[in-house]
From Swiss-Prot:
UniProt keyword terms in alphabetical order: Acetylation, Membrane, Repeat, Transmembrane, Transmembrane helix, Transport, Vacuole
Annotated membrane topology: Multi-pass membrane protein
Gene3D superfamilies, per the entry: Glycerol uptake facilitator protein
Modified residues (N-acetylmethionine): 1
Motif (NPA 2): 207-209
Signal sequence segment: none
Name the record gives this protein: Aquaporin TIP3-1
Record topology, Cytoplasmic segments: 2-26, 86-108, 168-178, 247-268
Organism: Arabidopsis thaliana (Mouse-ear cress)
Gene Ontology BP terms: autophagy
Gene behind this protein: TIP3-1
InterPro entries hit by this protein: Aquaporin-like (IPR023271), Aquaporin_transptr (IPR034294), MIP (IPR000425), MIP_CS (IPR022357)
Amino acid sequence: MATSARRAYGFGRADEATHPDSIRATLAEFLSTFVFVFAAEGSILSLDKLYWEHAAHAGTNTPGGLILVALAHAFALFAAVSAAINVSGGHVNPAVTFGALVGGRVTAIRAIYYWIAQLLGAILACLLLRLTTNGMRPVGFRLASGVGAVNGLVLEIILTFGLVYVVYSTLIDPKRGSLGIIAPLAIGLIVGANILVGGPFSGASMNPARAFGPALVGWRWHDHWIYWVGPFIGSALAALIYEYMVIPTEPPTHHAHGVHQPLAPEDY
């Protein structure tokens, strides 16, 4: 999978939104985000149903439940990124797309279309989960008891920073060469590991679409802003640090009137 060799900031060409490659990439983001959120949120609903029927407490609040949820997220994201990587780059996360935008690896038009696709994919996944589970409300994310807003925000910043840094080092860095299956595997593993760290405190979302779908369908908005602000700050920090401190310094490419040639679907 090729990557853009140089940073190129700009809004994008007017015809980029209707270009066949852009449409295919947007569809890939929609489908992969759907697959990821359906499996990830579904694993939580499945555990809750099992524990509601056989115990007095929710399964996700137990050590075993935490491990199972982390594994489900890791496996699902590994599969989702692998499925989309050669078409869209396999973002499957608005925060990853934002980091690529901040780093000059995608145009603003491409980022907007990815965000819309990712959010719609997450919403559809949660709607189908509610339908197929006979009305169970998606759980989504909220801060645990005793965890303040600042604590949760900083935790989401750190967790997302780690995720996007791994994405940059395995997928975006133009010096990396082809890593094949290692890239989506590494991304899935860091998400699983981060859930083991942050799950008991903030839920470890790291993904605004992953948080938005359950919040909308389950109508659970408590602390929701944290799961947008934290991941976006963390992704921007990771992108800027990797672009300007890890990747050799290069002058940004500017084009007339803020417009540049659209990047290929996998160039981010």
